């Protein structure tokens, strides 16, 4: 990849977070290849009849998770604090995601609490300029603590 390709990869990922900040899930998905992989490694939400895990495809699992997060945290936002890329289309991003809970989210009841949580996102952008893979990591225990969900086994 050329310097132009590296710049394009960063631009695509920056546009993704801009769309996320604007709650434009359709735009987030448009920036991804049709078969883009999706991995929210620590993600697991227990529902009444099923468990949603954070692995699959952007257009199925990713889209559902983003819409549900935005619905539960209507002021959800993000701040990109660091971004870097290489000539293979790999982009690493440190981003702080924050929001105030307005509805229950999975097993996390709504206490109206606010969270600020650092995340690491790893993207792979293909030669066509579309995101082919998204992987993200964060501290779920800290997220749940900030939202008042304390569990003792």
Q: Where do the language-model regions lie?
A:
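C-terminal and inter-domain tail/linker signature
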Residues: 1-153
């Amino acid at each position: 990849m050329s310097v132009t390709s590296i710049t394009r990869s960063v631009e695509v990922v920056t546009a993704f977070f801009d769309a996320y900040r604007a709650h434009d899930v359709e735009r987030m998905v448009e920036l991804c290849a049709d078969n883009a992989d999706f991995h929210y490694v620590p993600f697991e939400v227990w529902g009444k009849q099923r468990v949603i895990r954070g692995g699959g495809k952007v257009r199925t699992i990713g889209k559902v998770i983003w819409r549900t997060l935005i619905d539960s945290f209507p002021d959800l936002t993000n701040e990109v604090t660091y971004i870097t890329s290489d000539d293979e289309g790999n982009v690493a991003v440190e981003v702080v995601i924050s929001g105030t809970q307005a509805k229950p989210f999975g097993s996390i009841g709504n206490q109206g609490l606010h969270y600020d949580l650092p995340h690491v996102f790893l993207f792979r952008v293909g030669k066509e300029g579309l995101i082919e893979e998204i992987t993200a990591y964060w501290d779920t225990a800290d997220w749940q603590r900030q939202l008042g969900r304390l569990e003792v086994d």
